[in-house]
């Protein structure tokens, strides 16, 4: 069977996913490809100490990312700003839901210091949803971008931000700060969005991504979805087309992993072969960079993207 035929077969036969087996205590038994080694290196310890010293939050820790050990051993981390408590309670996310503390005015400078200490060429800045603030912390994100750019003028800055409840002026505040990559995740397919994402809508997320391209046509945009929540192949296909239709050049697809027993259970394990097939499909409909695999997360190996190539592509879209 040819590669393309094999991919089509996988996408049309979701029964080839693995059922989820559970232990007596209710915890899931993960397939072999999801078992992560815990590498330790001088860079891992350096990153750990630097994060503590600068009193920074990372999504690697707060969201219990399975790639933390690998990324920190490579000297990379995704910095989470605007606090460590989120105003939303999405059913896939391990970040604590609570009344957030006030923004810390010196946080942008601390993030910039982290970029300098780590010698980063690519930084990912993400945030908790701050629906308690009039601008959703958009101004704080913009100030962080500017602080990093001031000390690292050649760094690639990627932001992974909320939908700001659909307030396009706040989206424009981020755009005006000129990040290189504007990332906002769709997270899941349309049908599952009300269950998976608290106070978010499928169409609002697409509107945000479309607006970025409207006001900044050359800005690279990115989105991603999780698999294994009960979605169908047709729903994944539609979601990919929807993301591409609003101009996104980059898309990520990864396996949903249940962070705790209080969050949504995994419905199925998606095989590496199916992820490869989705990568081929996404590339076939025009995405310029696709990261698709069981352990892929939105910022996993974000620095592997060739920004110069994507900028040329953006000029043509």
Language model region names:
Residues 59-71, 82-97:
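Local cysteine-cluster metal-coordination motifs and their immediate loop/turn environment
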Residues 89, 133, 192, 261, ...:
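Glycine/Thr-rich phosphate-binding loops of Rossmann-like dinucleotide-binding domains
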Residues 94-111, 117-169, 174-208, 222, ...:
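Core AdoMet radical
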Residues 84, 162-165, 230, 295:
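Short, surface-exposed acidic/glycine-rich loop or hinge patches that mediate macromolecular interfaces
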Residues 1-78, 109-116, 143-154, 176, ...:
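Auxiliary Fe-S-binding modules of radical SAM enzymes
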């Amino acid at each position: 069977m040819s590669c393309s035929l094999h991919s089509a077969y996988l996408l049309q036969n979701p029964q080839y996913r693995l059922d989820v087996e559970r232990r007596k205590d209710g915890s899931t038994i993960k397939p072999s490809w999801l078992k992560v080694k815990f590498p330790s290196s001088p860079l891992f310890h350096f990153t750990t100490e630097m994060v503590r010293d600068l009193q920074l939050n990372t999504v690697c820790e707060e969201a219990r990312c399975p790639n933390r050990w690998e990324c920190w051993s490579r000297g990379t981390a995704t910095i989470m700003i605007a606090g460590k408590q989120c105003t939303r309670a999405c059913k896939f996310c391990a970040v604590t839901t609570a009344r957030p503390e006030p923004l810390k005015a010196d946080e942008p400078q601390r993030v910039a210091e982290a970029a300098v200490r780590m010698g980063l060429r690519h930084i990912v800045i993400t945030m908790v949803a701050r629906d308690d603030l009039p601008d959703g912390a958009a101004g704080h994100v913009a100030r962080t971008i500017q602080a990093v750019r001031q000390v690292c003028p050649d760094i690639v800055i990627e932001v992974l931000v909320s939908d700001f409840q659909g307030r396009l002026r706040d989206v424009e505040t981020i755009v005006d700060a000129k990040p290189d990559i504007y990332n906002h995740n769709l997270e899941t397919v349309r049908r599952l969005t009300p269950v998976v994402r608290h106070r978010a809508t499928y169409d609002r997320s697409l509107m945000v991504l479309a607006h970025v391209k409207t006001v900044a046509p050359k800005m690279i945009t990115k989105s991603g979805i999780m698999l294994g929540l009960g979605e169908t192949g047709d729903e994944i296909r539609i979601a990919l087309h929807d993301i591409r239709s609003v101009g996104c050049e980059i898309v990520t697809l990864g396996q949903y992993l249940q962070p705790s027993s209080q969050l949504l259970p995994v419905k199925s394990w998606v095989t590496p072969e199916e992820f490869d097939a989705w990568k081929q499909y996404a590339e076939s409909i025009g995405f310029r960079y696709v990261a698709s695999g069981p352990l892929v997360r939105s910022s996993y190996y974000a620095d592997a993207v060739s920004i110069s190539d994507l900028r040329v592509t953006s000029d043509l879209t």
